[in-house]
Amino acid sequence: MSISTITIDVQTDEKKIPASIHWSATDTGADKKQAAKAMMISFWDAAEKAALRIDLWTQDMMVDEMADFFYQTLMTMADTYGRATQYNDQVDEMKQFARNFYTRFRERQLQENKAQ
């Protein structure tokens, strides 16, 4: 049995707001830490039957980047759920929700840009 290690470094400002996020993992093959503007980590606590989460984003992450991040995360969550369950009908629903979410975001951005 082998052990993989994931390391996450979060630098915060004086108000404890993330200024930078860097991560590394033993199995990636990358020589140096990778920069990220956001992260979502979830752990399942079987005893409590609850998800434990760490959601962080840096102060310089733009709203459009956040929408892209959420869209891609929702799509990959659907793929993961599909691989685990083979419940393709629910996978399709999750992906449709993600597409609708992203479409509504784009429409909102267009409206807000017109108003300016």
Where are these regions (language model features)?
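Acidic surface patches and DE-rich sequence motifs
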Residues: D13
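Active-site- and interface-proximal helix/loop "cap" or "latch" segments in soluble metabolic
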Residues: A19-Q86
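C-terminal charged interaction modules
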Residues: D79-Q116
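Structured beta-strand/loop patches that form or line metal/cofactor-binding pockets in enzymes
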Residues: M1-V10
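Intrinsically disordered, low-complexity linkers and terminal tails enriched in Pro/Gly
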Residues: M1, A30-K33, L110-Q116
